Amino acid sequence: MGQKVNPIGLRLNIVKTWDSRWYADKNYADFVFEDYKLRAFLKKKLFHAGISKIEIERFTKRIRIRVFAARPGIIIGKKGSEIALLKKEIEQMITPEVLIDIQEIRRPEIDAQLVAENISAQLERRIAFRRAMKRSVSSAMRFGAQGIKIICSGRLGGAEMARTEWYKEGRIPLHTLRADVDYGFTEAKTTYGAIGIKTFIFKGEVLKADRNVKA
């Protein structure tokens, strides 16, 4: 089971939490679609800021958007000018009052989504996939990851037949629910077709003592 399922979904409410946090009755489908539109808009507009994930919380009359970025300065701008423009653009898309929080990712080398997107960018620049994967693996281990696994699937190197290649270093305990396993996925759009990239990064175990849970 642990080998097939999304590691974040498997650990929800154990060591991971939801990216969208709100309750809805009859407006559920509208809110889901609104969240999808917001994430797609922000990922496209703030691509150069290195966006890892976007959390959305809804209250009665306002919505809080928390953006996790490797380069928060690009989003905020000089004296907050860029973030003010961004807030206006979002308020034209949705009705509630918008609050935007920017969280800096201090070590993007061990953020699974950013590692996957970095490999994707290298493949689109025609860098050899093995070199890109090995570089990311060694960089993650150097910055404190306890284990990393990268899987690339598709017409690798322009081959006629699609195949899957992977590199792994350290350990990735996919069945251990207390293990903090980060997961990222993206696609590289190459001239030969799309190449899927999955990244698993093990950052250590979240023990009961750390979460203040009494036995």
From Swiss-Prot:
It comes from the Bacteria. SUPFAM superfamilies: Prokaryotic type KH domain (KH-domain type II), Ribosomal protein S3 C-terminal domain. The keyword Disulfide bond does not apply. Keywords: Ribonucleoprotein, Ribosomal protein, RNA-binding, rRNA-binding. PROSITE patterns: KH_TYPE_2, RIBOSOMAL_S3. GO terms for cellular component: cytosolic small ribosomal subunit. One of its GO terms (biological process) is translation. GO terms for molecular function: mRNA binding; rRNA binding; structural constituent of ribosome. SMART domains: KH. Residues 38-106 form the KH type-2 domain. InterPro entries: KH_dom, KH_dom-like_a/b, KH_dom_type_2, KH_sf_prok-type, Ribosomal_S3_C_sf, Ribosomal_uS3_bac-typ, Ribosomal_uS3_C, Ribosomal_uS3_CS. PANTHER family: 30S/40S RIBOSOMAL PROTEIN S3, SMALL RIBOSOMAL SUBUNIT PROTEIN US3C. Belongs to the universal ribosomal protein uS3 family. Binds the lower part of the 30S subunit head. Binds mRNA in the 70S ribosome, positioning it for translation. Part of the 30S ribosomal subunit. Forms a tight complex with proteins S10 and S14. This is Small ribosomal subunit protein uS3. The gene is rpsC.
